[in-house]
């Protein structure tokens, strides 16, 4: 199984959307009714559907998310036979990230439940694919803060020491 990442590909090639999700600082995973494993929300693009709409629809259907912010991360591809690809040919999908702030009270999909986790699961439905997608997301996110300008407010008077860390001095310029 080979997973690759691209900035973009022809839109017609995108057949899947996967949405790495968090809620209140926890990872969001789905457990399918017919499996004892966990997976990231995602699924097939329907005929004539915009791929970003696929991502939003799958997130809503599989997690019950009703309030969320979602953004595209990159395009990924998978080469090799798996549960959703019996030919093994390279297939492409859109990888997104969502921060979910509200869930519906009930799920109305093939998912048995949604689980919020502090750590990534050990028993994945797609163990050769989805951990790599999360690794890519984490790399992209860490790169987005490196070199960023951060503005802070010092809440101590200049020329004083921090009350807990006596070696931390706020100099007067």
Could you describe each region identified by the protein language model?
Residues 45-69, 76-132:
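Unchanged
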Residues 142-173:
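Hydrophobic N-terminal alpha-helices or hydrophobic patches in metabolic proteins across all domains
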Residues 19, 72, 96-98, 150:
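A structural signal for short, well-ordered beta-strand segments
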Residues 22-61:
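Conserved Nudix-box catalytic region and its N-terminal flanking loop in Nudix hydrolases
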Residues 15-17, 24-27, 92-93:
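Short, surface-exposed beta-edge/turn micro-motifs
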Residues 10-14, 88-89, 146:
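A short catalytic or substrate-binding loop motif that flags glycine-/basic-rich loops and adjacent residues
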Residues 1-18:
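Acidic, metal-coordinating catalytic segment for phosphate/diphosphate chemistry
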């Amino acid at each position: 199984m080979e997973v690759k990442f691209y900035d973009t590909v022809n839109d017609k090639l995108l057949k899947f959307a996967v949405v790495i999700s968090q809620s209140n600082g926890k990872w969001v995973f789905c457990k399918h009714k017919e499996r004892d494993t966990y997976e990231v929300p995602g699924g097939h693009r329907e005929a004539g559907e915009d791929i970003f709409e696929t991502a939003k629809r799958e997130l809503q259907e599989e997690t019950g998310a009703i309030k969320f912010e979602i953004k595209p991360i990159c395009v990924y591809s998978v080469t090799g036979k798996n549960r959703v690809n019996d030919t093994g040919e390279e297939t492409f999908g859109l990888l997104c990230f969502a921060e979910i702030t509200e869930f519906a009270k009930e799920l109305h999909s093939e998912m048995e439940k949604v689980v919020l986790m502090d750590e990534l699961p050990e028993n994945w439905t797609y163990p050769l694919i989805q951990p790599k997608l999360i690794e890519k997301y984490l790399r992209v996110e860490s790169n987005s803060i490196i070199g960023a300008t951060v503005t802070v407010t010092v809440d101590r008077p200049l020329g004083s020491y921090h009350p807990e860390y006596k070696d931390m001095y706020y100099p007067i310029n």
